[in-house]
């Protein structure tokens, strides 16, 4: 399998996001990399599903709450930016204050 660097990055985000989902399902609080991976993976998948940038910007704020992450993590993530592939091309999705 010959993947481009971009494809490798997306695969890494997906894998880390899947791990974060499993840990969250077991009742564990997520750390910084896990929280970023979970939100990023969800945004990439949402773009693949055909959601708009505006929908994803809102959706990204609904994925995690303060109770689901370790102390201090929400303050470490003021925003998340993901370059996602949409049916009409690649666009930058920015989610401000993703963990409320």
Swiss-Prot record:
UniProt EC number: 3.5.1.5
**Keywords, ordered alphabetically:** Cytoplasm, Hydrolase
Q: Which CDD domains match?
A: Urease_gamma (cd00390)
Q: Give the location in the cell.
A: Cytoplasm
- Cited HAMAP family: Urease_gamma
As recorded in UniProt, coiled-coil segments are: none
Q: Name one GO biological process term.
A: urea catabolic process
Family the entry assigns: Belongs to the urease gamma subunit family.
Q: What organism does the record attribute this protein to? A: Pseudomonas paraeruginosa (strain DSM 24068 / PA7)
List the taxonomic lineage: Bacteria, Pseudomonadati, Pseudomonadota, Gammaproteobacteria, Pseudomonadales
Q: Which InterPro entries match?
A: Urease_gamma, Urease_gamma/gamma-beta_su, Urease_gamma_sf, Urease_subunit
Q: How does it assemble?
A: Heterotrimer of UreA (gamma), UreB (beta) and UreC (alpha) subunits. Three heterotrimers associate to form the active enzyme.
GO MF term (any one): nickel cation binding
Kindly state which reaction or reactions the protein catalyses: urea + 2 H2O + H(+) = hydrogencarbonate + 2 NH4(+)
This chain belongs to the protein called Urease subunit gamma
- One GO cellular component term: cytoplasm
List residues traversing the bilayer: none
Write out the pathway annotation from the protein's UniProt entry.
Nitrogen metabolism; urea degradation; CO(2) and NH(3) from urea (urease route): step 1/1
Looking at the keywords, is Coiled coil present? Answer: no
Q: Does the UniProt entry include the keyword Heme?
A: no
């Amino acid at each position: 399998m010959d993947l481009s660097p971009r494809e490798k990055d997306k695969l890494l985000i997906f894998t880390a996001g899947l791990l974060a989902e499993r840990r969250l399902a077991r009742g564990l609080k997520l750390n910084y990399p896990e929280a970023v991976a979970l939100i990023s993976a969800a945004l990439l998948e949402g773009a693949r599903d055909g959601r708009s940038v505006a929908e994803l910007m809102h959706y990204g704020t609904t994925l995690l709450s303060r109770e689901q992450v370790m102390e201090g993590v929400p303050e470490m993530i003021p925003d998340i930016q993901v370059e996602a592939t949409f049916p009409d091309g690649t666009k930058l999705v920015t989610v401000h204050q993703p963990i409320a």
